[in-house]
Amino acid sequence: MAKGLFHLTHGIIPACDVLTLREFERILEETSSVECVVAYKIGSVLALRFSLPEICRIAKKHTDLPLIYDHQKAGTDIPAIAEKFAESCEKSGISAAIIFPLAGPSTEIAFIDALLRHKITPIVGCVMTHARFLTSEGGFIASHAPYEVFEKAIERGVQHFVLPANKSFEPLAAFISKRCINPSFIFVGIGSQGGSLAHAFSSVGRHNAYAIIGREIYEKDIRLAAREFCTQALKFK
């Protein structure tokens, strides 16, 4: 049994990055009773089309599990937006929010602090799963930036971190583990993007580990796919 945001130390988080309410409800109906589903990730597409409060209302007809909002990518605006963002999440019924604070330390601090004030668990990431993101990959974002982002997040009390399972995440996981007393790692990029749940979970040892999984669940037999991923996750319980 885990303490805090999730009720288990290892589990999966279905990503509800779909276009219709029927698709969304089907994910909930098919997975809410699967043993190690620990939360649901709600993306910006559903929120924009139907409103975040409405999405949360529908979700809560099917589940009591935490709802994680992924604004794709929150934390890239000016610091003044943070309070409005956090208040909107709280009033909608969100439990946690993912931010990628690429706009600098002032924005990162503002978003983390605002979320905590509104009793929303901040989940911080900095490396996306696609190619040519960091400068070392031919992208725009400095390769040392994730270390600075995560260090600042830990200083502000963050304990939940997003890492890309389909990239070389191990140095970042080790960096976080040395500085955060009880980190929870949330992996993305598993399945068609090349990441392995088993490798990701085993790489962080005794620490809590979770996998956000979207298309590999909702584009297949939803219940069966969720159960298969849960079988993998429960091996690390």
State where each predicted segment sits.
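Conserved N-terminal beta1-alpha1 strand-loop-helix module at the mouth
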Residues: 1-68, 76, 152, 219, ...
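Conserved anion-binding
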Residues: 9, 76-169, 181-185
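Hydrophobic faces of well-ordered beta-strands that scaffold small-molecule active sites
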Residues: 10-16, 38-42, 67-71, 97-99, ...
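Short, small-residue-enriched loops and turns at beta-alpha junctions
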Residues: 18-22, 45-49, 73-78, 104-105, ...
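Catalytic cores of alpha/beta
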Residues: 27, 82-88, 173-177, 192-207
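Non-catalytic positions within long, well-ordered alpha-helices that form the structural scaffold/packing
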Residues: 32-33, 89-90, 154, 201-204
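Alpha-helix-loop-beta-strand connector modules within alpha/beta enzyme cores
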Residues: 48, 52-71, 113-127, 174-192
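Glycine-rich phosphate-binding active-site loops on the catalytic face of alpha/beta enzymes
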Residues: 92-104, 190-197, 206-224
